[in-house]
């Protein structure tokens, strides 16, 4: 297995996303500074804000009042690559705790239908709380196992699969990962789970729709090799380049784009955007 990177992502700052229902990223920076944040400025990813707080961001009145949510810049980039639009039907198949779902519904202008799924009620409750705090009306948190067909899910214009993974790209945030041995059986289980969720997404996506697969690992078996295997099973899909500009240092290849913290300043992260051609 590849070792992860313990490099501190986002310059050691907290990466945020402004709630467009309450103002622009620039206005959020002003409010953060006025409320006691040490620093607040635009980040690398369009619409992101990097801030330094005296304590936890969750202690901020602006957080409690739904002015922003916390989401790493690399994670924001993955959600932006979905290119969700107002009026779309969008699925977020591995949505908890809900940060990417919030960004998706922001991109949709809180118009259309976003179904945000996760495997347990406890995890779905995290999504509900985040959506309620931010004040969005068109998000449907739902318990659903992405590895299995779910007849209650709608056909979608776009789908995000931020898959369960080994987490080797975020050691700075979760250093305990480095002390956990990822045995071959567990690694194989992760690969099978990722594969099953991708197959579920393929069946739920409309022709012409966008599928984004992402992980917070740098392991090729979970990233480029997983995408290559998916494309071999599903020749109706092709890799596409999203409209959003990738930050400097991203490695872009045939089967996706990789962020390595020491090169991009963001978390270790992988994403691949695909289109269903028929």
PLM feature spans:
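S-adenosylmethionine
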Residues: 1-278
């Amino acid at each position: 297995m590849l070792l992860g990177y313990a490099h501190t992502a986002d310059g050691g700052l907290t990466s945020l996303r402004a709630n467009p229902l309450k103002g622009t990223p620039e206005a959020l920076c002003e409010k953060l500074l006025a409320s006691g944040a040490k620093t607040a400025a635009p980040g690398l990813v369009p619409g992101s804000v990097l801030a330094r707080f005296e304590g936890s961001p969750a202690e901020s009145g602006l957080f409690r009042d739904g002015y922003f949510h916390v989401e790493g810049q690399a994670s924001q980039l993955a959600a932006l690559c979905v290119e969700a639009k107002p009026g779309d039907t969008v699925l977020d198949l591995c949505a908890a705790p809900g940060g990417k779902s919030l960004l998706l519904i922001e991109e949709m202008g809180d118009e259309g239908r976003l179904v945000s799924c996760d495997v347990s009620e406890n995890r779905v409750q995290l999504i509900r709380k985040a959506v309620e705090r931010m004040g969005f009306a068109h998000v449907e948190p739902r318990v659903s196992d992405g590895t299995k067909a779910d007849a209650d899910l709608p056909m979608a214009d776009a789908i995000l699969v931020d898959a369960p993974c080994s987490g080797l790209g975020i050691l700075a945030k979760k250093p305990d990962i480095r002390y956990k041995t990822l045995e071959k059986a567990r690694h194989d289980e992760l690969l099978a789970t990722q594969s099953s969720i991708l197959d579920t997404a393929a069946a739920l996506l409309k022709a012409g729709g966008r599928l984004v697969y992402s992980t917070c690992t740098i392991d090729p078996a979970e990233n480029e090799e997983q995408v290559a295997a998916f494309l071999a099973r599903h020749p109706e899909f092709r890799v596409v380049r999203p409209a959003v500009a990738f930050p400097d240092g991203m490695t872009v290849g045939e089967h996706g784009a990789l962020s390595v913290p020491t090169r991009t300043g963001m978390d270790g992260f992988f994403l691949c955007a695909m289109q269903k051609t028929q």
